[in-house]
Amino acid sequence: MEIVIVIPARLDSTRLQRKMLADIEGEPLIVRTCQNAMRAECTDRVVVATDSPEIAEVLRKVHVEVVMTSRHARCGSERIAEAAESLEGDLFINLQGDEPLIDPATIDLVAAPYLRGERPDCTTLVFPVPAAETALIDDPHIVKAVIDSNGYALYFSRSPIPCRRGANLSTTFYRHIGIYAFQREVLQKFAGLEPSMLEKEESLEQLRLLENGFRIQCVETTVDSPGVNTPEELEFVRRIFREDLPSL
């Protein structure tokens, strides 16, 4: 099975302008993400899909493969589907460009079911969060998932799900980590669908799959992977790199 990691990247992000080129200890954020992606064992091919000549120029200087896409993509997976038209591959891993702390082993996790011979429509990652972590659970920037007994997603939301009734602290919540693996044909079908009602309401592209009858297998990880969406999160990541943790 030929696997390709594709990182969608745009310059005009909403909450943190030009974050892909933000400096993190001498390297742009997008380069830091690519460096960790290249350490994944499931593939040695990492491609960035972007509509920004500025991002493309930065990446080519450090020998990262780039596919230029149009400005019409409505989400990262649509951008990847466009890039996939010019790429060979059976499985495409959508890794967010704002994940400079991503553990390469977690990238391997989304590919693992396919490498075992399974054929889910799509896989993604979830991270368990104790019910006592109310600040995380209530944060609308943290996407939560509920999954069935077979490990497939029932729903994703920015709201706290399941609803907490009373003071029961035994419930485990799941934080969604936005890495996806798509079979080529599912990725193509996804891109051909119009954004769904719930997708637009929650601003979560994966709901387009669920609303159209696709199943998303959720793989649990014990390694969290905070993204960069705010100045505070950017400074947190910079501090981690300055401290030069062994995991990096």
From Swiss-Prot:
Q: Name one GO biological process term.
A: lipopolysaccharide biosynthetic process
Taxonomy, superkingdom: Bacteria
The alphabetized UniProt keywords are: Cytoplasm, Lipopolysaccharide biosynthesis, Nucleotidyltransferase, Transferase
Q: Which reaction does it catalyse?
A: 3-deoxy-alpha-D-manno-oct-2-ulosonate + CTP = CMP-3-deoxy-beta-D-manno-octulosonate + diphosphate
Under the heading Pfam families, the entry gives: CTP_transf_3
Which family does this protein fall into?
Belongs to the KdsB family.
The protein here is known as 3-deoxy-manno-octulosonate cytidylyltransferase
Organism ancestry: Bacteria, Pseudomonadati, Chlorobiota, Chlorobiia, Chlorobiales
* Gene it is expressed from: kdsB
